[in-house]
Amino acid sequence: MKYMRTNSLKRLFTLKRRSFDEDEANPHSSIIDQDNDENFKNVPLSSTPQKPTWKCFSFGEIFDATNGFSSENLVGKGGYSEVYRGLSKDGEEIAVKRLTKTSSDERKEKDFLTEIGTIGHVHHPNVISLLGCCMSNGLYLIFPFSSRGSVASLLHDVNLPPMDWQIRYKIAVGTARGLNYLHKGCQRRIIHRDIKSSNVLLNTDFEPQISDFGLAKWLPSQWTHHSIAPIEGTFGHLAPEYFMHGVVDEKTDVFAFGVFLLEIISGRKPVDGSHQSLHSWAKPILRQGQIEKLVDPRLQGAYDLPQLNELAFAASLCIRSSSTWRPTMSEVLEVMLDGDMDKERWKMPEEEEQEEFWGFEELEYECGSSFSVSPRDSTSFMDTSLDSISTRSS
């Protein structure tokens, strides 16, 4: 593909928006035939697509909002982007994500364009909303500022008190709802590909919002999966079929969500100091039914046992090696909210059960040192602690 300059991005973005407006005028031209798509059954959808609410910011607006991209307002930095806190003319706190000047290759620009094209058309309380973009003097995305930072920053900051159980449960349920929306509630199926605690942001009420759509993929209704190379994502969250074969579909996100649930329950990081993944540590405990051994010891027993059982059962289904035997996110929500823990329903055939523990965790560990992940892994969108935000805002 030819190298895309900023002017080309502007033109392509304009075409994307025009195309969406045309779809709004003719709802029957949608890419997905909702009447024939099983994925959309029992999912409330508006009869017509919602028009994007983002706007194009001028460079002057975001320059002034961030005080000239002052280092005092820098709240996150990754392999190819930086995030600045800002204050709009209307007094709204915003986050400005900037493609760094050193990241001038085609792939980084493509990631930005992907994020605009994906998140610009989603509307759900558990998915971060795009306020707008700017394509003058660089590439910028503008979001509402998430004052509490990411789940990872709150869960793993040793200087903060442990997150209480009810907040953890609220985060788990809200994130599941947001992911279910991406898979089944959008006009086009969206596979996020990088679900993890540092990509789930929290508002003042601890309502979670899924963020960072740079790796996201549209999945047309007639397709069963994408085949992707090179493999990008985060070590410890990658589903076996993606890690080994590049196969991506909704179940890829389901696996990562299972790891996210285990992280919420245990307070452990997805990969520990010995390079053991969280899901490989948890599987034997789940298999033996010793659920309470999963719980973050910092909670000192202060948790709701029925809720714990539901989250743990959901996690055990999500992290299955065989994607066929993983639930959809709708089914995950049934477990988490309705207590649907019918073990007979989810019992795998004996031969599948034996293959479940054939050694993917060992393979993952062997490949870990040479496995190449996206440079975005170093720091995710606004992955910053409350302390650093409050210090810089004072």
Report the location of each language-model feature:
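Intrinsically disordered, low-complexity cytosolic regulatory tails
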Residues: M1-P52, D304-E310, S321-S322, P327-S394
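Protein kinase glycine-rich loop
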Residues: E72-V83
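Glycine-rich ATP phosphate-binding loop
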Residues: E82-S103
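Regulatory alphaC helix of protein kinase catalytic domains
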Residues: F112-G117
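Short beta-strand micro-motifs within the conserved protein kinase catalytic domain, predominantly
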Residues: S129-L139, S147-R148
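Conserved catalytic-loop aspartate of Hanks-type protein kinases
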Residues: D253
